[in-house]
Structure formats: structure tokens, C-alpha cells
């Protein structure tokens, strides 16, 4: 058996680990759709319900050139699957950059050990392999020091939240229910959401209108001026009005509004005349009121019963009349008795 001369190549360990050769990512060849391999046409975006006011897609996912397509005739570039022209399909350039990767969330900070708990320690093997007393001293110091809670990771999570708008073909397939549904939602930062609305705390409260207060003297002076002007402002009276307004202490516009509002109260307009006529008519229709000068005589007292007979209750006059009649009859009987004798 022949001896073989074998040479071993020494291995090199940079930084204590073997570096693996990075393999380049395989690039898939782009599929050309009648454009000479330069561009790729994806899903069909033609709206088949545009005449009805809606939005409907045919579902074609990629442009496939028909056998009768001629690059020299642009009108013949139609899809063999859906029959639509190539311009209705979404154009995707070959050298378009890949979409950005999703943001990586930061790992949560490790929780510090509580007092009285033992944590596993990862120790690297030393030269000697023995342990010194300094490790135990350090562990006692770790147990005795105060434990502070970790900071909340809310700020880091909010800072890494990035909004990626949807692709145009996805926005077109949402339907024609409204423009508000096609627009991407706005992302508001926590600071902007917590900030109060501009304009103070009033918000939508309407502003209260300022009302001018007049004193009794100002009202009297304005009434005198209005009566002098005939409750009308004319151009020839501007100098007088300006002078009186300076003396009274009110503006010309304020005096004009006051005169217009109180014209019917002091002048007696149509409403005042109507109320006066109605009150006079009511007074004329009412009968005159004459209070009695002397009280009426009292009614006679009711009769009182003085005797009782078989016929009922008799008054004193009736009893007297009956007694008189009885006496007369007795005298007649006495006078007739001697004659008969």
C-alpha cells in the first residue's frame, strides 16, 4: 500500500468564530409583458362599473400578451386573460426598489432581580477555573442595593411607529362609496392629540355680544336730541349730532341705533295709537258705575206664632179678630133673649 502525501491547510478563526461566505441573493428574471422585458405589468385596474357609478375589477392578476399582439401596433397590446389593453394594468418597473422592511420593535429591558431571589449567572471559564471571594461580596452588594422600576417603553414604541400608505391599486379597489374612504388615515402624534384646540378653552362657544349701558341722564339727553331732530337723522344735522354726541359721551352710531329702537316708545307710533284707541273703546262700552248713596230698607220681620187652633197656627191679628167676632155674637144673643121672654 502506497503512502499518500497529504497536506493539511491550517484553519483560521478570526475573532474566535468561522465566517460563512455570504451567498448573493438570487434575482428572479423579470417577466416582460410585451414591453421588451424592461417593465412588468401586474393586475388589471380597469373599472367595469364606471357607467353605473360603482367600482368593479375583473380580478386579472397579471398581464399576459395575446398571440395577436404586435409591438408595432400599440392598439393590439391586449391581455389574453381579461381582454383589456395593457395600459389598464399596473406598470411595475424592473429596477424598482423593494418595499422597506417593517420596523423592528426594541426588546424589552430585562427586569432587575428582586431582593431575596437568585439569578443564574453566566460565567466564562477562566484560566485557573477557581472562584474568588470577590464574587460573593459583589452578589451581596447587588442584593442590598435598591431596585428601581424600568422606564416604560412607550416613547420608544411610539417613535418607531411608521405609517406606510397603501398601494394605488389597493386604494382604487376600495369602491366608490366616498372620497373619504379612499384617503389614508392621518397619523397624529400623542403631543398633537393631547394639545388643546386653538382659541383657548372656549372651543365652539359663541362670543357674547356686548350691550351698551346708558345712564338716566344720557337717555334724557338723547331723547331731547331726538325730539329736536324729529326722530330722523338728516345730512344737514350732522354737525349738531356730532356736538351733542360728544357732550353726551356716546358715539354717533350708538345714538342712531338707540333712536331707531326707542322711536315708537317716545313718539307713539302705530302700536301706541292702536293701544290707546282700544283702551278708549273699552272705556266707552263699559256702563257707568254709580255707588248707592243710602242703604235699602231692611225687610219686614217674619210673623211669629201666638196661638194654635185646629185649623193651624194663628197670628195675633187673627186671634184678635176672632175674639171681636165672638164678643159681638155674645151681645146679640143677650139682647134677643129678653124679647123672646
Swiss-Prot record:
Location, primary (coarse class): nucleus
Pfam families in alphabetical order: ZF-HD_dimer (PF04770)
Keywords, comma-separated and alphabetical: DNA-binding, Homeobox, Metal-binding, Nucleus, Transcription, Transcription regulation, Zinc, Zinc-finger
Site features described as Required for DNA-binding, chain residue numbers: 259
Quaternary structure annotation from Swiss-Prot or TrEMBL: Homo- and heterodimer with other ZFHD proteins.
Matches recorded under NCBIfam families: homeo_ZF_HD (TIGR01565), ZF_HD_prot_N (TIGR01566)
Protein name (Swiss-Prot/TrEMBL): Zinc-finger homeodomain protein 9
Organism (species): Oryza sativa subsp. japonica
Gene that encodes the chain: ZHD9
